[in-house]
Amino acid sequence: MGQASIQRRAGRPRRTATAAVRASQPVCHLCGLPVDLTLQRTGRGKHPLSSCIDEIIPVIRGGSITDPANLGHAHSVCNN
């Protein structure tokens, strides 16, 4: 099992880091516009401006998914 597989199963530490990033970073780190936390999934998937968490340094390149310093708050559309 690779490092990416192991880290993706981080569970609670990942959720804790994600919650911290959403609370402390109210703007998209990619475009600089505010992220509306009330936008949720629609019947056909995510709203384009809904919240997602982006790995600044991908796990495959040694980044951590449990370190808030490596996570950025983004719009779904900006992160794709």
Question: Model-found features: residue ranges?
Answer:
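Short, charged surface segments at domain edges that flank catalytic/cofactor-binding sites
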Residues: 1-40
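Cys/His/Pro-rich metal-binding microdomains
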Residues: 29, 72, 76
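Histidine-centered nuclease catalytic patch
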Residues: 34-72
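Short, intrinsically disordered, charge-balanced linker/junction segments flanking boundaries
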Residues: 78-80
